Amino acid sequence: MTNEIKTLSERIDTLETRLAYQDDTIETLNQTITAQWKQIDALTRQIAQLSERLQEAETNAPGPANERPPHY
């Protein structure tokens, strides 16, 4: 019976150690995902701004209908 208790105690210690490592890994992954979402949000805002600037530039640029052909 004492051998069984020792074996069970070792198994519990092993499981507690693995759980501690898993908790640390989960926290690290959570921090990484949070940082990535912040970066994705910043990039999304930047793309929206660039798209808006491009549309403004296209609106203000003279179109081909207003330009004379190169041979004139």
Swiss-Prot record:
<comment type="similarity">
    <text>Belongs to the SlyX family.</text>
</comment>
<protein>
    <recommendedName>
        <fullName>Protein SlyX homolog</fullName>
    </recommendedName>
</protein>
<dbReference type="Pfam" id="PF04102">
    <property type="entry name" value="SlyX"/>
</dbReference>
<dbReference type="InterPro" id="IPR007236">
    <property type="entry name" value="SlyX"/>
</dbReference>
